[in-house]
């Protein structure tokens, strides 16, 4: 197995974009655990290193609480982690399972025989190389490989919200908070989250409107958001008690974008499926994050809908399978097939890992069984996922006094 990574660390935006926590309602909902598998293996390693706190343990320890609940979250079992602990844990997992990792490498060209993907061209400091592959999984976050392969994708070139996370230190006597309708800054809201070390926070308060497919937008957005970081810090110093002596530790290596293209799959995750809490028979994962819409024209979140703690829904296998006749390619992560209003529900950290794990498992089974990746037996896939610790039905979470404050 080969893994091609553009950055120098695995984890995508979770390490390179400073998305330093798993949101409440993604892996845990109320008294139920929803996502384990690879995600849980990573969290377990990070916890052992002192680099993460599970959501239910965070609440039971009363660390960083009470939260400001103006976002109306009804379940605050957030799992924060240290990006460095994540990087190290991911490296260890790859080494233990014999995965060949290519850091600082781009996948630049697809190789096909007819409609079958058979590998690709990669480029890095060693020049151009070819990797032949029996199966390919696109977890680029932008459906980049799927587009190269000729799979139909939606949202290509669409503009949307971009943000550059940054970390601040020396914050005193303050709790994580959210305040909407803040006109003094481009993001339009106060939004910051705890890091593992007391006094350190991750701030999500910069904003640029651009396209995932535009290098110019990424460049301009990075420059503008980096400038905004200083502006935001000054705003917090002047208006938020506890930030008087705060300073910027660093800014994330890359922007995060909500405007990336997505696969047009055999099935599509829809808002209706979430609102009805559907549990399809071909599900490959379960989760509970609600609907979180950001308008390019307005700051912060514009529409938030949370499920009741303990509720959840399933994600079908068809969202990782191209509708186009492209064989031996599956898609995982935040570019799986969704309608726009459902994107926020399946792009979060743990569920992105879950769909990626399912796509990879399906590819492995299809090779063993001698079938195309899209034609893998669903029962066989689900059995393999469960054997590897994936949850297709919830299991009880350790009890907490309450899920919110």
What are these regions (language model features)?
Residues 13, 34, 38, 57-61, ...:
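Flavin (FAD/FMN)-binding glycine-rich loop and adjacent Rossmann-like elements that form
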Residues 1-3:
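N-terminal Rossmann-like FAD-binding beta1-loop-alpha1 element of flavoenzymes
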Residues 5-109:
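Conserved N-terminal/central alpha/beta ligand/cofactor-binding core
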């Amino acid at each position: 197995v080969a893994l091609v990574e553009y950055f120098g660390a695995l984890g995508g935006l979770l390490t390179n974009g400073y998305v330093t926590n798993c949101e409440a309602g993604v892996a845990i909902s109320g008294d139920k655990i929803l996502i384990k598998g690879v995600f849980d293996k990573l969290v377990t390693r990070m916890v052992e290193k002192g680099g993460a706190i599970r959501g239910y343990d965070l609440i039971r320890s009363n660390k960083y609480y009470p939260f400001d609940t103006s976002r109306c979250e009804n379940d605050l079992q957030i799992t924060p982690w240290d990006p460095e602990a994540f990087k190290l844990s991911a490296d260890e997992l790859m080494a233990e399972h014999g995965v060949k990792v290519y850091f600082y490498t781009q996948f630049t060209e697809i190789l096909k025989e007819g409609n079958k993907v058979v590998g690709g061209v990669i480029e890095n400091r060693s020049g151009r190389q070819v990797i032949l592959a029996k199966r390919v999984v696109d977890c680029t976050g932008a459906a980049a490989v799927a587009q190269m392969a000729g799979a139909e994708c939606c949202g290509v070139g669409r503009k949307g919200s971009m943000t550059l996370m940054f970390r601040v230190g020396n914050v005193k006597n303050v709790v994580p908070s959210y305040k909407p309708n803040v006109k003094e800054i481009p993001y339009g809201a106060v939004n910051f989250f705890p890091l593992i070390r007391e006094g350190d926070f991750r701030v999500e308060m910069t904003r640029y409107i651009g396209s995932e497919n535009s290098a110019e937008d990424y460049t301009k957005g990075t420059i503008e958001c980096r400038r905004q970081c200083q502006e935001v810090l000054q705003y917090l110093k002047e208006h938020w008690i506890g930030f008087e002596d705060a300073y910027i530790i660093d800014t994330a290596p890359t922007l995060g974008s909500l405007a990336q293209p997505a696969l047009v799959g055999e099935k599509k995750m829809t808002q209706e499926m979430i609102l009805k809490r559907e549990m399809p028979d071909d599900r490959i994962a379960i989760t509970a994050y609600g609907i979180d819409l950001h308008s390019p024209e307005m700051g912060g979140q514009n529409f938030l809908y949370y499920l009741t703690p303990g509720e959840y829904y399933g994600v079908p296998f068809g969202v990782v399978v191209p509708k186009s006749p492209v064989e031996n390619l599956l898609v995982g992560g935040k570019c799986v097939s969704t309608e726009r209003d459902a994107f926020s529900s399946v792009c979060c950290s743990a569920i992105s890992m879950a769909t990626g794990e399912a796509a990879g498992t399906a590819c492995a089974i299809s090779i063993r069984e001698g079938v195309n990746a899209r034609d893998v037996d669903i029962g066989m896939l689900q059995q393999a996922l469960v054997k590897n610790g994936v949850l297709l039905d919830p299991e009880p979470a350790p009890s907490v006094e309450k899920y919110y404050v």
